[in-house]
């Protein structure tokens, strides 16, 4: 693992959907389809940011801003680059862009058993505001609860 906190982040486009879906499949047990990612990236109010190297994407975040609220739809980091700071870097970049697009608060759902993600969101200043019972399906097929987290966004100067 290489420290990648300062890796440049670029806007993701629908043409990136194939490689982002492949990364999502490496990062999650229930990956998103290429078409779902492409459709989101083509949508209005959607934020898509990615970090990459010569081999392809290392991480990405999809978010959207609607009526003053921003939501992280997914954030994925290649397993070989986890705990490198990349997730926090992508989250900060998406938060900044969401604030510039009028977002006053940022929301997300996270599995109660995803300790790495919970640590990331805690360090980023998110607080628990709700619980969605059975929101996810675990690897064993059983329902897994999701925490709903919120963080106020600082308005850009």
Predicted segments with their positions:
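Short amphipathic helical patch at the helix-1/turn junction of helix-turn-helix
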Residues: 77, 111-112
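Conserved short alpha-helix immediately C-terminal to the canonical SAM/SAH-binding motif I
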Residues: 90, 114-117
